[in-house]
Amino acid sequence: IRGDFGKSYIDNKSVGDKMLEMFPYSFFLVIISIILAYLISIPLGIYSAYKKNRLFDNGVSVLVFMLYSLPSFFVATWLLYQFSNPDNLLWFPSNGVKNPATYNNDWSWYDMDSIKHQAPYFVLPIIAFTYSSFAFTNRIMRVSMIDVLGADYIRTARAKGLSERHVILKHGLRNGLLPIITMFSNVFPAAIGGSVILETIFGIPGMGGAVYEAILGIDIPMIVAVFTLTGALTVTGYLISDVLYAIVDPRISYSKK
């Protein structure tokens, strides 16, 4: 018994060390993209529900369905063609997470030089990760808020003379967020799988490619480590969701009576 995940069958490196190198990249991309998607899609979903079937709602719906229908590999390739192409706009690097010729240190969350150097490499991947999450989350938020705004207690709140802002944000938003919180429980496990396609296109050394290689190479230690970490993160995600349920919905309480 070693007390760890052993060594990879592919390169004979420690599985734990390999995961420590790759996991932060996938986790960072997933977390940042989810935060951005929530910050954009939740307000838009609320306002679309309030303006149901009007010009704003119809316009947002068309845009969201267009974004949701675009394959991630197409968006990633288009972003590289437009913004990492000397013939168009060479604004961002096209591949990898750093330039070994000018910066050869490891990624660090606390080193500002590391963050400044590597930040441009993450802009396009974050956009590619965010757009599909934004489209799906926006639709869920809109449908949830439409159901909530048609409830009896919302009509009662309006009959009391409360402002629309107070009715929506104070009475409607809490219940409208419940499906979004349920979705949030899957964020952490998603950081393990990452996105094989997007990480490959942008040259991100994350977990997606590692999982794919481990399966093809029948790398048992790596596969066991991935499933173990996925299980731990799944439990963590559900725990955080349960806590958020109790915060958002006053009907839920975990205290003993």
Residues of each region from the PLM?
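Short membrane-interfacial helix/loop motifs at transmembrane-helix boundaries
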Residues: 1-17
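Short, hydrophobic secondary-structure boundary micro-motifs
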Residues: 5-9, 75-76, 91-95, 157, ...
